[in-house]
Amino acid sequence: MPLLPSPLGSLSAAATAAPRRAAAAAGLSPLLLRRRAPIAGALLFLSLGAFAGVRSLSSSASARMESTSTTVPSIVVYVTVPNKEAGKRLAGSIISEKLAACVNIVPGIESVYWWEGKVQTDAEELLIIKTRESLLDALTEHVKANHEYDVPEVIALPIKGGNLKYLEWLKNSTRES
């Protein structure tokens, strides 16, 4: 059997023998393996090989962000809500209070979680909130005071870099801590 092309470069026969044996044991045809190998190789490259490059891009963007005084440390915050009306109401109050520059409302998510001793499943909507890191505590308190849930989700992730003009707009559209 000829070696399969891979985005990672040439592979030795030994390197491809184990996957071929596993595919044969699983009842997969060589044709199916040939079709899937480039996809698997690309996924492997993206998840492992490109990771270092992405990290360096992120680091350089972060360095650019820190080198200018026109931006502030920023975050993305996830908050789930039970329905569209609750999402619009909460998003509007967050923006009115200048606790965030933008809130995206993502409809149609399904959440599976542990609550009151059993697995629960609910249709929800997701708010994706872009704001200053320094406003997280005030935003969290606002969500807790204005949310229908006993324990609302408020999860913050750092923004490591991005479009500097957007990050400047984020800063200028939110209140100072």
UniProtKB/Swiss-Prot annotation:
GO biological process: protein homotrimerization; response to metal ion
Cellular compartments annotated: Plastid, Chloroplast
Organism domain of life: Eukaryota
Entry keyword Cytoplasm: no
Xref: Pfam families: CutA1
Record-level Gene Ontology MF annotations: copper ion binding
One GO CC annotation: chloroplast
SUPFAM superfamilies the record matches: GlnB-like (SSF54913)
Keywords: Chloroplast, Plastid, Transit peptide
Record-annotated disulphide pairs: none
Keyword Transmembrane: no
Stretch forming the transit peptide: 1-60
Self-association and partners: Homotrimer.
Annotated family: Belongs to the CutA family.
Protein known as: Protein CutA 1, chloroplastic
